């Protein structure tokens, strides 16, 4: 029997970037099931169409827009088409991310460093610059950072550094966008999605990760979606500038 969810987001309009699969799709689905109208976005039209169809099959009001977050015109289209259809924006989840290389930082090519910064940090800032005039009073911005942001090392070192930057960006924008918009972040632990398959695809590595968590398991997209829904809702109306770590008890101090 499916758990009945509260309708905390009734009447809200939510945009989630990179939301056709994995954590992004999980968040979009949860928002929709809690009553929000959701805007799905991703780089490929086929993926957007498939995700929208899945959401609509569950009775969710879903709208899809192709958006590569590093493309300025795509970002503007995402904002403009959402406002044209719904008249407002209440919730923004910046989920798009890239990890094009597992090289050590001092061996990383400049093009890789540029892409990591552009997709993981800069694109979210530019997107919010476009969205800010349309955000409703009481709106919520959520960055998806990572447990790797607290201890950037190994194959995720430079990726982790960009996620550390999001911890600071959350604090900075919470101050800049207050009091009308709250800005928070979710820091997922290890979740077995396609994006993380280079790590979680190995049973040996998975077991090692599970041993490091107090709850002895990997995270799920549902775990991350529940955290995002809380931060998007009025249940967190007195919370801003914070990062909610959802990592089963893995160490999370800078």
Swiss-Prot record:
GO terms for molecular function: oxidoreductase activity. Its EC number is 1.1.-.-. It is found in: Peroxisome. Pfam families: adh_short_C2. GO terms for biological process: fatty acid metabolic process; indolebutyric acid metabolic process; response to indolebutyric acid; root hair elongation. NADP(+) binds at residues 15-39. This is Short-chain dehydrogenase/reductase SDRA. The lineage of its organism: Eukaryota, Viridiplantae, Streptophyta, Embryophyta, Tracheophyta. The gene is SDRA.
């Amino acid at each position: 029997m499916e758990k009945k969810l509260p309708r905390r987001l009734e009447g809200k309009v939510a945009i989630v970037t990179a939301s056709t699969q994995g954590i992004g799709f999980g968040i979009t689905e949860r928002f929709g099931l809690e009553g929000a109208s959701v805007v799905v976005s991703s780089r490929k039209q086929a993926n957007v169409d498939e995700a929208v169809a899945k959401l609509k099959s569950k009775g969710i009001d879903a709208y899809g827009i192709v958006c590569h977050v590093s493309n300025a015109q795509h970002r503007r289209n995402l904002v403009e088409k959402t406002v044209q259809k719904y008249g407002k924006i209440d919730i923004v989840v910046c989920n798009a991310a890239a990890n094009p290389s597992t090289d050590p930082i001092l061996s990383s090519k400049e093009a890789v460093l540029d892409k990591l910064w552009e997709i993981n940090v800069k694109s979210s800032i530019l997107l919010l610059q476009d969205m800010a005039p349309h955000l409703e009073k009481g709106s919520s911005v959520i960055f998806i950072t990572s447990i790797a942001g607290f201890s950037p090392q190994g194959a995720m070192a430079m990726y982790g550094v960009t996620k550390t930057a999001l911890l600071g960006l959350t604090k900075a924008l919470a101050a800049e966008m207050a009091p009308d918009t709250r800005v928070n972040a979710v820091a997922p632990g290890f979740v077995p999605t396609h994006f993380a398959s280079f790590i979680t695809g190995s049973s040996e590595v998975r077991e090692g990760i599970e041993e490091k968590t107090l709850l002895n398991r990997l995270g799920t997209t549902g775990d991350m979606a529940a955290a995002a829904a809380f931060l998007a809702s009025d249940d967190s109306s007195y919370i801003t500038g914070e990062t909610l770590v959802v990592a089963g008890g893995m160490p999370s101090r800078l």
